[in-house]
Amino acid sequence: MSDTITSASATARYVRVTPMKARRVIDLVRGKSVAEALAILKYAPQGAAEPVAKVVASAAANAENNFGLDPRTLVISEAYANEGPTMRRFQPRAQGRAFMIRKRTSHITVVVESQKEGAK
């Protein structure tokens, strides 16, 4: 059995985007190569595309710098957005009432894996 490391990960915590919106963007790039994923995210209209692209680029950089993996062979094997803490704010309403505004945060994790050149 080989002891070589073939994967690297990156996590962005407390990102001010709702997990549901982040998952919409993550579903676009899961299973794609890093270069293809970054190209998709660059032109994706969703606001969550920017933080997800940062995490993908960071995971690729971790793979290259920490483990010496070739960036051209990297594929996004895992990507998920978990819920972070929710900030609660009050919005004043009519007749002395107050409504709760929930500002949700997410923890975005991306794992990239090195695959053989011929494998798809």
UniProtKB/Swiss-Prot annotation:
Alphabetical keyword list: Ribonucleoprotein, Ribosomal protein, RNA-binding, rRNA-binding
GO cellular component terms given for this protein: cytosolic large ribosomal subunit
GO molecular function: rRNA binding; structural constituent of ribosome
CDD domains: Ribosomal_L22
BP terms from Gene Ontology: translation
InterPro entries associated with the record: Ribosomal_uL22, Ribosomal_uL22_bac/chlpt-type, Ribosomal_uL22_bac/org-type, Ribosomal_uL22_CS, Ribosomal_uL22_sf
Family classification: Belongs to the universal ribosomal protein uL22 family.
Function, as annotated: This protein binds specifically to 23S rRNA; its binding is stimulated by other ribosomal proteins, e.g. L4, L17, and L20. It is important during the early stages of 50S assembly. It makes multiple contacts with different domains of the 23S rRNA in the assembled 50S subunit and ribosome.
Subunit structure: Part of the 50S ribosomal subunit.
PANTHER family, per database record: CHLOROPLAST 50S RIBOSOMAL PROTEIN L22-RELATED, LARGE RIBOSOMAL SUBUNIT PROTEIN UL22M
Protein name: Large ribosomal subunit protein uL22
Organism: Corynebacterium aurimucosum (strain ATCC 700975 / DSM 44827 / CIP 107346 / CN-1)
Gene giving rise to this polypeptide: rplV
